[in-house]
Amino acid sequence: MSGVRTLLEKSGYSEKAIEYYEKMLNVGEIKDPDAHFAYTGPCGDTMEMFLRIESHIITDAKFRAIGCAGSYASASALTEMIKGKTVEEAEKLDEQDILNHLGKIPAPKIHCACLAKRTLQEAIKQYKETRQ
């Protein structure tokens, strides 16, 4: 068991949240994305989200972040959750959906799910504004 994994477990992260953090799913950039937004949360973590949208369905989602394990786990989970969903379905997801999907993260890190959701909301808003 790695030292980081042990620290995350002791801090209160679920096995699923730790796996999302360790695997770093969807970390990266989409060239010429249909939607893109970067946001810095009140904690100082910065997240950037890239979406590929075809026929109003999110076919790919990636992110980059400067942040903690909670931010990476939340964004990894959210980008997995929205793939294959319509833009409207993705918009309806909230922080609690992300937290439920992750299982458990420490209470002081709940804002990380808010950061991921806010970044997604703003990317979708930008997408809609450019499509009008």
Q: Model-predicted segments: where are they?
A:
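Domain-level signature for proteins that mediate thiol-based redox and metal-cofactor handling
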Residues: M1-Q132
